[in-house]
Amino acid sequence: HLLAIPSVKAHSSVMTNARGAFSASLGEWGVFACMYFAKRVDEMRAAQRESRWIRTTVGMIQGKEMLVVGYGDIGQHVARRAKAMGMRVSAVRRTPEKTDPRDEHVERVVGFQSLKEAVAKADYVVVALPATKETDKLIDGDVLNAMKETSVLVNVGRGSTIDEDALVDALSNKKIAGAALDVFAVEPLPSDHPFYKLENCLMSFHCADLTSDYHDLALDCFIQHAKEYVEGKPFTNVVDKELGY
C-alpha cells in the first residue's frame, strides 16, 4: 500500500517486508478452507443449531487436485501442507522458471497464460497473489467460468486479485461449489455486501495470519533487518518497487 504513494516509490532507500513471518498460519488456513468444504462443516453446524441428528457422506481432500495461484512464500506453505495431506498440487506463477527443481510439493508449475487451463483441472484453487497491476482481478469471470462446478476458490493473498462481482455471480448461480475468503477488495467489507449472506461463502476477516504471536513474528523480522543494516550485510526480503512486492 505504501508504494501507491509516488514519493515513497521514487525514494532511493531500500524497502523490505516481512515475507515469511506469517506464511505458516496462512498455509494452514488455506488447507483448513479446503477441509471445511470437503467435510461439509456448514451443514453439520446448521443441523447442530437446529438440534437435528443427520448422517451424511463427507468428502476427502486426499487425492484431490489443488492449484495454487501465486507460488511465493505463502503459496509454497499452502502447497507443503496440502501435499502432506495427500493432495496433488500444481501451481501458477508469474515466473515458473524460478521454481526450485528440487521442490517436491508441486507436480507442475505454469505461467499466468495457462491459468484458465489450469483451473479447469483443479478441485481447489488457492489464490496467494500479491496486489499488483498484473494481478488486479486476475481471477475474473472467464477464470471462474473455467472452474469445475464442484470446485472451491480460496483466497489468502489480496482481495484485489479477484473480481468480486463475478465471484458473487458464480456463487449465487452455483457455477462453483464455494469460496473461502480471508481478504477483500474493500476492507472492512461493507455490511450490505452479498458475501455475508451467501451460504456457500466462508469468510474470515483478514485475520488468517493474526496469530497470538503475530507481533513477535513481525518483531523478529524487523530485528533481522536491523542487524543486516548495522552489519552492512545485504537485506533479505527486499521489495521490488516496480513489481510492487
Task: Go through each PLM region and give its residues.
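Phosphate-coordination loops involved in phosphoryl transfer and adenosine-cofactor binding
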Residues: 12, 62-65, 141, 150
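Short, polar loop motifs at secondary-structure junctions
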Residues: 1-2, 93-99
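Residues at the starts of beta-strands that form the adenosine-phosphate
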Residues: 65, 84-88
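Rossmann-like adenosine-cofactor binding region
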Residues: 96-194
